[in-house]
């Protein structure tokens, strides 16, 4: 079934004289939706309301859930006629067949962008161990492996420990700078200098891949998730990162790599006519755990490729200032549930001080203030109640 161009309804105007139900048209959602609010105020319910309609309307969606509660409910409510479209990456389930390889099927002209996204994701999660030498060596390893046909994250470690493998990879490289690094610079490193540079990489990546389930997902799945194909075919990707079971670092890195790949897959649609780019919507709960500056900067590009992001989290200052400005500056619809004092002051200014700090501090659960994108233009801020999932 072709996707339907129906609006996604999610709110009712909170006015005695105006109780209209409202929502967003698909074209306005390509300008992205940013959702913020304290725990327990209704964010999860809003995301559920929206994604259930997307599936019913025939759209392709991805939902990245750090805990699994929301995607479990969504999975149980997928319309029967769409169940064949589901790819459920349930990370803690040792029997699930799906996996994801961030190094595979990257077009040559996209390698620099992919490498930057992968490195930023690793730096975000492994920041306590990050250093200039570590980044330099890791960058050259990632660039080299992105040129290979069937590389996996485990091959990063092989680049350091297996001289024959390193030589085989190096001989096939098209990038002369990366080739020179491995043939000349790396080979000149003393044992101690080399060991100091790669020890943290081996420790961090080794710990990630020592979990048998994560290793299988990242290096040897029965079925590889191909995000670009899922976009073009309008499929449903549900991701349970199970942070409480696999650990925060592992869940955050896998989520950040997935979000980066969604962006890269979207931009690879440049080769497809605008009218043939099927709408695709990506939901990210606890957005701050998975976003990098590369991802935030992609927001301005994604709308051209008919991909809309729905990013939700609890506190503005969970985001670094440059990421915060990039996300808010490129989100056409901004939705606020109840906030803390610091965030209320910031959002009041974002809403042009039409909404006071006190208004944002005192919102009841499932009540919101928002700026809504309507036919390509943001509305004035107004108050509303969110609709329950149906």
Describe the predicted segments one by one.
Residues 23, 228-229, 383-388:
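Short beta-strand elements
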Residues 66, 312-318:
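Conserved H-loop
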């Amino acid at each position: 079934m072709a996707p339907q161009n129906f609006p996604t309804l999610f709110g009712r105007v909170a006015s005695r004289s105006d109780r209209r139900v409202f929502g967003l048209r698909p074209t306005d959602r390509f300008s992205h939706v940013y959702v913020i609010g304290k725990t327990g105020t209704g964010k999860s319910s809003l995301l559920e309301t929206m994604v259930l309609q997307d599936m019913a309307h025939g759209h392709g969606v991805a939902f990245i859930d750090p805990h699994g509660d929301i995607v479990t409910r969504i999975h149980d409510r997928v319309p029967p006629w769409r169940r064949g479209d589901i790819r459920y990456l349930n990370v803690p389930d040792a029997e699930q067949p799906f996996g994801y390889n961030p190094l595979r099927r990257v077009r040559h002209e996209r390698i620099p962008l992919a490498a930057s996204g992968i490195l930023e994701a690793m730096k975000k999660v492994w920041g306590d161990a990050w250093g200039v030498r570590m980044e330099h060596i890791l960058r050259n390893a990632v660039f080299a492996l992105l040129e290979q046909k069937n590389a996996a994250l485990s091959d990063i470690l092989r680049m350091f420990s297996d001289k024959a493998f390193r030589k085989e990879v190096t001989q096939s490289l098209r990038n002369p700078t990366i080739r020179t690094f491995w043939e000349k610079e790396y080979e000149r490193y003393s044992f101690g200098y080399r060991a100091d540079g790669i020890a943290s990489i081996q420790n961090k990546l080794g710990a990630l891949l020592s979990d048998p389930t994560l290793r299988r997902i990242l290096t040897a799945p029965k079925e590889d998730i191909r995000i670009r194909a899922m976009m073009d075919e309008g499929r449903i990707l549900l991701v349970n990162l199970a942070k409480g079971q696999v650990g925060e670092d592992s869940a955050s890195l896998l989520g950040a790599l997935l979000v980066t790949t969604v962006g890269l897959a979207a931009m690879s649609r440049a080769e497809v006519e605008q009218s043939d780019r099927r709408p695709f919507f990506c939901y990210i709960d606890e957005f701050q755990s998975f976003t990098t500056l590369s991802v935030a900067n992609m927001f301005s590009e994604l709308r051209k490729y008919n991909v809309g992001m729905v990013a939700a989290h609890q506190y503005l200052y969970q985001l670094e200032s440059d990421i915060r400005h990039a996300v808010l500056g490129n989100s056409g619809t901004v939705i606020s549930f109840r906030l803390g004092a610091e965030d209320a002051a910031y959002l009041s200014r974002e809403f042009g001080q039409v909404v006071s700090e006190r208004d944002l501090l005192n919102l009841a659960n499932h009540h919101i203030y928002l700026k809504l994108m309507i036919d390509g233009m943001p509305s004035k801020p107004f108050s509303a109640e969110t609709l329950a999932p149906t």
